[in-house]
A protein has these predicted regions:
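Positively charged n-region of N-terminal signal peptides that target proteins for export
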Residues: 1-4
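C-terminal motif of bacterial Sec signal peptides marking the signal peptidase cleavage site
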Residues: 15-18
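N-terminal, intrinsically disordered, polar/charged segments of Gram-positive cell-envelope systems
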Residues: 21-52, 57-59
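Extracytoplasmic/periplasm-facing segments of secreted or lipoprotein envelope proteins
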Residues: 45-82, 91
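Mature extracytoplasmic domains of secretory-pathway proteins
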Residues: 69-119
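Residue-level recognition of conserved beta-strand edge/terminus positions
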Residues: 119-120, 159
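Short, compositionally biased
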Residues: 127-142
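Well-ordered alpha/beta subsegment
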Residues: 138-163
Length: 163
């Protein structure tokens, strides 16, 4: 009787070992399918949208900061907002966002191309320099000449949104 019980235990042990190996093989198969099927990845990529800034209908290349103000602005503007901006001081364009968003102002000296939040509800784009207390939102990647021709006007129209 002891021999029969011992034989059954050995068979059960081998059966359990076989189950654990097939589990690993299924896991490996899933990993292989993930790497061999780029369709899933590209489908996800195509669903992602890009947050775009346009000045007078010209798309500008901007590098956004990673902060709460930018996150809130992007969430607010994801369906698109249009802001009429007015030149101020001969070095910046200023326009109301239309709502108050989180700010973390600090005394900074801006450079041409800097995009900042002022008073938690206004966006400012610089084509000159200034020192004041702002929350930096980003920087437009253009040279001084390009910024001047785009922004050195009495008014510009700024559009923000996902595309």
């Amino acid at each position: 009787m002891k021999k029969i019980i011992f034989a059954i235990l050995i068979i059960i042990c081998f059966s359990l070992l076989g189950c654990s190996n097939s589990k690993n093989n299924l896991s490996d198969l899933d990993k292989t399918n993930e790497t061999e099927n780029p369709k899933n990845t590209s489908e996800m990529d195509s669903e992602e949208s890009i947050f775009v800034m346009k000045i007078d209908n010209i798309v500008v290349d901007i590098t956004w900061e990673k902060n709460d103000s930018v996150n809130e602005l992007m969430e607010y503007a994801k369906n698109g907002i249009t802001i009429t901006m007015h030149q101020y001081g001969g070095f910046e364009q200023v326009g109301s966002i239309g709502k108050t968003i989180t700010s973390n102002d600090s005394q900074i000296t801006t450079n041409p191309g800097d995009v900042v939040l002022y008073s938690s509800n206004q966006i400012v784009i610089f084509f000159g320099k200034n020192s004041w207390s702002y929350t930096k939102l980003g920087h437009i990647n253009m040279n001084q000449s390009e910024l001047n021709s785009l922004l050195n006007k009495s008014n510009v129209t700024l559009k923000l949104g996902e595309e």
